[in-house]
Amino acid sequence: QHNTVEHCDMVELDEELVDMVKVHMKEWHHDCFDDPRANLVHKDARKWVEDHKGANYDVILSDLPGPIEGGPALYLYTKEYFQHVAEALSDDGVFVLQSGACNETYPYCFAAVHETLGSLKEQFPYVRGYYGLVTTFQMPWGFILASKKHDPLELTPELIAQRLAERGVTTNRYYTPRFHSAMFTLPEYMLRAIKQHGRILTDDEPFLWEA
């Protein structure tokens, strides 16, 4: 959608799932798999990141299943993985990942991931949590942006509107310039959860989703 994108690697372990999406969810992907800028690979995401140290990605997005015991994403929420991500990013790169529920009954995954990324101050000086309403989950869902140089809280509605216009983005149904700051305003219960339940996740002690 953004005309500034020159190349995009999509790393997805489940080839069968992608084939299903291509056929049955065109209203979501809008034939993006046919875009010449897109490169789809079916490999383990962690190994891909580890093998691409120095690749200078401007952005890495981790849209993953939860860290379930025995699941494929268990070690994609740990400090070691985040360090590999930092090494694969450019000097002003940005990392974004979905981080679990952002509701009052189960804020634990988000709190732990936020604390873990926050511990990597040398790699990611800016760590900002935000949330959105995901209709398929029927609850607010959390995301975290970790950046080497750019603080999303410094973006004004005017600057966001200008950038979207320059990039030819006109069809957003959720994210808008006026909504930007609201997304990054976490509820008070989430701020308390980060303080009370935040912990550093490692390969030896990963987060195990129990909800």
Feature names for model-found ranges:
Residues 1-94, 104-117:
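The AdoMet/dcAdoMet-binding core of the Class I SAM-like
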Residues 82-83, 108-134, 144:
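Conserved Class I S-adenosyl-L-methionine
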Residues 102-103, 134:
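Conserved beta-strand edge residues that scaffold enzyme active sites
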Residues 126-211:
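Soluble small-group transferase modules, centered on the S-adenosyl donor enzyme superfamily
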